[in-house]
């Protein structure tokens, strides 16, 4: 979960961010 938070916080790839968000949901 911490990794996901860091990835989302960085916002390096908007596409990946959306995918991660979908997985988290």
From Swiss-Prot:
Metal-binding is among the record's keywords: yes
Known catalytic reactions: beta-D-fructose 6-phosphate + ATP = beta-D-fructose 1,6-bisphosphate + ADP + H(+)
Pathway annotation: Carbohydrate degradation; glycolysis; D-glyceraldehyde 3-phosphate and glycerone phosphate from D-glucose: step 3/4
Enzyme class: transferase
UniProt keywords, alphabetically: Allosteric enzyme, ATP-binding, Cytoplasm, Glycolysis, Kinase, Magnesium, Metal-binding, Nucleotide-binding, Transferase
Record-listed ATP binding positions: 11
Primary location: cytoplasm
An example Gene Ontology molecular-function term: 6-phosphofructokinase activity
Cofactors named for this entry: Mg(2+)
A GO cellular component entry from the record: cytoplasm
Family named by the database record: Belongs to the phosphofructokinase type A (PFKA) family. ATP-dependent PFK group I subfamily. Prokaryotic clade 'B1' sub-subfamily.
Function comment: Catalyzes the phosphorylation of D-fructose 6-phosphate to fructose 1,6-bisphosphate by ATP, the first committing step of glycolysis.
Protein name per UniProt: ATP-dependent 6-phosphofructokinase 2
Species name: Thermus thermophilus (strain ATCC 27634 / DSM 579 / HB8)
């Amino acid at each position: 979960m911490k990794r996901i938070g860091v990835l989302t916080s960085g916002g390096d790839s908007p596409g990946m961010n959306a995918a991660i968000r979908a997985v988290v949901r």
